[in-house]
């Protein structure tokens, strides 16, 4: 998946650097889809990247700051949960590997790239995901613990009791 993310970053290299990923979908490839970039509006961009096995679809928004949304933990009791932390060093290593120059992914208060969060979700599900759709509601920061919770076919990520990511998946 890092190769797909690297390919998506390369496709978007000439875009303004203040784009953030707000939706991510990952599908097992069943057709002959091809890579493309499509402007939905002046602020919304869709990027589709493929390889032999996966279709990686990103919806990006020109939005410099996201307002946090909170959800009481009692609203969504977890059946599977993993508390994780992604260090600044891990984030820097990843961004240099995929040549990600997005300033949101740099520095002491960096936002964790979507592909690293996707890896954490795959760890919780032990790679048993065929298709996943994620909506990013608030940034997940480096060097701060976050929890990945899985209930039925829903996945959520909380950081400091703020709902950051919510999505669904199929096995």
Whereabouts are the PLM-identified features?
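Generic marker of "main functional regions" within proteins
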Residues: 96, 104, 121, 144-146, ...
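A contiguous, surface-exposed recognition patch within enzymatic or periplasmic domains that forms
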Residues: 77-110
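HotDog/MaoC-like acyl-thioester-processing domains
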Residues: 1-83, 140-143, 149-171
